[in-house]
């Protein structure tokens, strides 16, 4: 059903059973999958490609222009949102900066009210962004991450699978998989609760904990991880994933919270 006050151009591609609320605005060429809901006053801008079973809340904006001083508004770029993802009230997802590029949000994510995903970000499946958190441009996030309220992520950092970030914290360095992160660029141990909730095998949980202790035992964590990776000191996919995260050259990683060591 399309409300009589909604603006829906003929070029918009709507799937079956799509509901468009009052005063919602869709721009030319947008694509919305089957069984999706666009609530009142939402704005779906050109370049938006929204999957099946999604929802976009009131006053949310999908595919807004990048907040980049050098961006040319004539550039044709996109936002891709996976099936089952909810974009709640006032949330914003900006399109990519380069022609033909895409900002990507995976399947079954929850972008809570007033959260923000900047241009060229890639967010995995089943991620949760709590209210008022913000991802700068080009952030890369794995699957099953939980970003608490008020968290600020600097542009171009990476966030690994299964990460839990505490509220009102800030990061300008990469956050390895399966860890708890808090404050400013600090790690506070393994996200054991999150791993268990995802039914991670006990052997994998124990291995990630062991590797975490070895990587963060002292010295340069990337060097420590590299040695363990070369030795194939892992026997589970989770252990390998944890170590390989440190293999990308030229990166900086969050450090141990020294207060936690006391």
List the model feature ranges, each with a label.
Residues 1-5, 10-11, 16-17, 53, ...:
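Terminal amphipathic alpha-helical/low-complexity segments used for targeting or macromolecular assembly
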Residues 1-186:
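Structural signal for interior beta-strand "rungs" in well-ordered beta-sheet cores
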């Amino acid at each position: 059903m399309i409300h009589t006050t909604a603006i829906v151009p003929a070029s918009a591609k709507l799937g079956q059973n799509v509901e468009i609320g009052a005063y919602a605005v869709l721009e030319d060429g947008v694509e919305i999958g089957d069984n999706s809901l666009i609530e009142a006053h939402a704005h779906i801008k050109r370049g938006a490609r929204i999957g099946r079973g999604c929802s976009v809340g009131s006053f949310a904006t999908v595919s807004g222009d990048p907040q980049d001083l050098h961006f040319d508004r004539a550039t044709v770029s996109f936002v891709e949102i996976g099936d089952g993802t909810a974009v709640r009230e006032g949330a914003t997802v900006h399109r990519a900066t380069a022609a033909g590029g895409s900002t990507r949000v995976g399947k079954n994510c929850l972008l809570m009210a007033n959260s923000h995903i900047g241009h060229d970000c890639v967010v995995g499946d089943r991620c949760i962004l709590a209210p008022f958190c913000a991802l700068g441009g080009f952030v890369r996030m794995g699957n099953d991450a939980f970003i608490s309220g008020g968290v600020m992520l600097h542009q171009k950092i990476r966030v690994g699978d299964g990460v839990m970030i505490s509220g009102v914290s800030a990061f300008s360095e990469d956050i390895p998989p399966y860890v708890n992160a808090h404050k400013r660029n600090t790690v506070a141990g393994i996200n054991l609760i999150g791993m268990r909730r995802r039914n991670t095998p006990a052997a994998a949980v124990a291995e990630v904990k062991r590797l975490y202790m070895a990587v963060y035992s002292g010295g340069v964590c990337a060097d420590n991880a590299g040695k363990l990776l070369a030795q194939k000191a892992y026997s589970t996919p989770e252990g390998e994933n944890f170590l390989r995260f440190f293999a990308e050259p030229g990166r900086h990683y969050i450090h141990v919270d020294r207060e936690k060591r006391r």
